[in-house]
Amino acid sequence: VDTTAKLALLADAAKYDVACTSSGIDRDARMGALGNATAAGICHSFSADGRCITLLKVLFTNVCVFDCAYCASRCSNDVPRTSFRPRELADLTMEFYRRNYIEGLFLSSGVLKSPDYTTERIIECLRILREEYGFRGYIHAKAVPGTSSDLLAALGLLADRISVNMELPSSESLALLCPNKTRDSIVAPMRQIREGIAEDRDTRALMRRDACYMAQRRPARKTRAFAPAGQSTQMIIGATPETDFQILNLSSSLYKTMHMKRVFFSAYLSVNEDGRLPQGNAVQLDREHRLYQADWLMRFYKFDAAELIDEGQPFLATDIDPKANWAINHLDRFPIEVNTAPYEELLRVPGIGVRGAKAIVGARRATALGEAELRKLGVAYKRARFFITCRGRYQGHGTRFDKESLHAQLAAPIQAGSHGRRSGKVLAGQMSLFDGIG
């Protein structure tokens, strides 16, 4: 099979993996090397400086000895199979980089022969990119559950980010749908990655404080950091009966115990006939979107999972976003005065984000804020007005300050909106990398 045919097959197979995220690292270009990851983001995501960059998102192989019920590449499926050679994929990545099609690589894989054999091939590909071709662009590599600790350590020195898929929210569901994987085979590499990142960070901090090191820092800078962009993971939702309550509590635990940079949620998409899987073709994109919103609140707005959801109501509302839902269920905390409220309270107001709250705190030092000033600061005033006062005057006039009335004002169903579509799910939307190649 030629390289073009391999790429068409393996890029299409990679579209089911959604764990792409911005890197947050600042490795820049260097004389004699190619690419850079300065404030880098990745495919369909935004970097710290607002840029949207793309990755070559591909599987190393779709040959797999595992038989996960929901996976298109499972060993029991009769589908075309192929694999890249390490240098072949490295050359392909460089060709697309030189054509300015991509700025990095997102590499996942089926399990070819064994986890260790697969990881050895991936490491060789990344070694060629980094050491022979001097590629300094962003690389996100998926670690295969069951990979030995030595190989995982080597992978972490070549990739910017490593991720191990959690796959499913419970051990019971994992045993049912992924008979070749165990919770320990997934959690153990996560733990090793966490410890490797911490050890690398501590070692570099000690080296920076050492006078002898500082005197010789130029050659020492060539030492690669271990997974400098951290680790992430992904869970499939809707394939098994776990509730949003269970999923968000697991997500919260992963952030706290494994120091995850990101937990991704992927709405179950039916690609196989299997009695263990849900019947029908419904894709729960609305549920996925609400989980992402709740996850965002936990990461950046200092919400705890227990504040957003509980066992009494174990699923997030789909007709209203989690922040607005929390606010209308805690009306005793509102309205707040924007000119005096602490930053932490401003963050809890629907329509006021992190940047908006910081802008309010800064601007009110110079002048008292009203509607016009809030709009200029980027606040979503149409939503925020129900929960604030400006100079002592309530801004939500004309609407009763009760749960039912505010719910009617803030309800925002998403099934028919832009959040109800995603190229990787509803459309086979990964862009063609062949246009214009003669």
For each feature predicted by the language model, list its residue ranges.
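Long, highly charged, low-complexity intrinsically disordered interaction regions
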Residues: 273-347, 381-420, 424-438
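Local cysteine-cluster metal-coordination motifs and their immediate loop/turn environment
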Residues: 62-74
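Flexible glycine/acidic-rich beta-alpha junction loops that bind and position SAM and/or redox cofactors
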Residues: 116, 169-178, 203-242, 261-285, ...
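Core AdoMet radical
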Residues: 74-89, 96-122, 128-149, 156-216, ...
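Conserved, mostly hydrophobic/aromatic
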Residues: 55, 68, 107, 164, ...
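Catalytic cores of alpha/beta
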Residues: 147-158, 240-256
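Flexible, acidic/Gly-rich N-terminal and inter-domain linker regions that tether
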Residues: 1-63, 380, 388-389, 396-438
